Amino acid sequence: MALLQIAEPGMSTAPHQHRLAVGIDLGTTNSLVATVRNSIPEILTDEEGRSLLPSVVHYLKNGSAHIGYKAQAAQNTDPKNTIVSVKRFMGRGLKDIAYAENLPYDFLDTPGMVQLKTVAGVKSPVEVSAEILATLRQQAEDALGDDLVGAVITVPAYFDDAQRQATKDAAKLAGLNVLRLLNEPTAAAIAYGLDNGSEGVFAVYDLGGGTFDVSILKLTKGVFEVLSTGGDSALGGDDFDHRLFCWIIEQAGLAPLSEIDTSVLMVKAREAKELLSSKSETLIDAVLTSGEEVHVTVTAADFIQMTQHLVTKTITPTKKALRDAGLSVDDVDGVVMVGGATRMPHIRKAVGDFFQSTPLANIDPDKVVALGAAVQANLLAGNRAAGDDWLLLDVIPLSLGIETMGGLVEKVIPRNSTIPCARAQEFTTFKDGQTALAVHIVQGERELVTDCRSLAKFELRGIPPMAAGAARIRVTYQVDADGLLSVSARELRSGVEASISVKPSYGLADDQIAQMLQDSFKSADVDMAARALREEQVEAERIVLATQSALDADASLLSDNEREDIVALLDSVRQAGSGTDHLAIKAAVDALAHGTEEFAARRMDRSVRSALSGKKLDEI
């Protein structure tokens, strides 16, 4: 673990003490690396002066790989072994990958994360990403002339535990020490906040190659606070390419294409999309493997019309992020545009129209995330300069909870909570003599465990046997600055403890998270009714167990008629508990509680007499 330097507040480290750290934007389409030199963040270029590294890896038969531009050239000739947009596969199972059937890869649907079969062997998305990160590390060390102490790597705000952990694993494989994982919109806000001295409420609209993220941030006196986040993984520059690709096939009347022809036309579609940002029309020329020639002219108006629905879809999560932050459009002081896809004029116009202001784009949208990450990396490495006294407050996208009796969810950390954070709650045992407690960690907004996502389970054993409800078990949830969760459980009387770091097998897609939130809103009334029923059923089960235990121990305190009355009340509770009317269950439980008050009083009297028997007054 790298040691942080300690210096007087406001003092910068001496030049010979400057520690080399970088910010890395590991993007779907392109990746970048940046650092801070002479207090100014800058992109580190390769030996040919190029700042962008295409996020493409081409595997060869001899086991080696080409990364970046050289790999990009192989997309048309060897698409099966040329992995592009690998970020979309990080922490995902095969069923989670959009358009999987249209991709040229041989996927292996292995437990956990999907694998890709190449001529160089089976590769995981983590290994592919590590190739890109290792190239960026080498590029940075060549430019800076020394080894790096660490890196801040950016991830989409909606990446969950598994996707973040996969990113950290890839960095470790690439020989990088991860100082922190930083949400991409937050990195952009850091760049704008420091460069432009901005204060107020800002929306960060981040449309990259494969994901769409929107974050609402508040910048006040050096504090960067994320108020809410939103997003949709079905929206990205790749989807605009795919729509134009389909349009080309329709216009040219082409039959089903081979993998190579598909790859050729996808590249042509991407090139045309980029040209239409500055031209009114462009000609798409291609020669297919069959010898057939494709000549199609596409205008900017055509492109706007065919992709307008994609642009409109970005506004829905933007509206939701504002609602989550408790704000309206009028409360937003500015909009930051991030991601290469925001270069498209009709996207900028749609965002400007929605927020009724001209979006901020004076920092290159391809570079702004890496520049912000570099600033954060510089601070975490200990290179604090005068004025570097700002605070970063990020949030988690979905609530984290625990399963309680009856399959109910008790939320421990609500969504949009600022991280890093820790929350603790006390729980107890349900049965007499219970010596173990199962801790089931879940993620989501619904009231029942079956409607949420299971993250992990562990057991706390060694609880001293005692009456139900007597044990005190403190469960603590901790989310670190990278958004990774750890949970511990401790029985307070005995001190026995168990813990777990949550590393689920694969992650949630952005649209799955958005769908979970939508489901929670739509099902709120049904969920609350289901929760009310389960709570009453759990209480009924508890009081039946307690009453039966009391009868078994102290039936001699009751007359035959009294005992029969209590047994009848018990039967009523059991019968009501098997039904679906929570009010009927509550009425039966209340009747049993009232009907056993005298019995409880007699048991208490006996216990007191037994405790005082044989003792003198001065001993009490």
Swiss-Prot record:
Keyword list, A-Z: ATP-binding, Chaperone, Nucleotide-binding
Among the GO molecular function terms of this UniProt record, one is:
unfolded protein binding
* Database matches in Pfam families: HSP70
Which InterPro entries does the protein's record reference? ATPase_NBD, Heat_shock_70_CS, HSP70_C_sf, HSP70_peptide-bd_sf, Hsp_70_fam, ISC_FeS_clus_asmbl_HscA
Gene Ontology BP, a term: iron-sulfur cluster assembly
Which family is this protein grouped under? Belongs to the heat shock protein 70 family.
HAMAP family documented for this protein: HscA (MF_00679)
Role noted for this protein: Chaperone involved in the maturation of iron-sulfur cluster-containing proteins. Has a low intrinsic ATPase activity which is markedly stimulated by HscB.
Its protein name is: Chaperone protein HscA homolog
Q: What is the lineage of its organism?
A: Bacteria, Pseudomonadati, Pseudomonadota, Betaproteobacteria, Burkholderiales
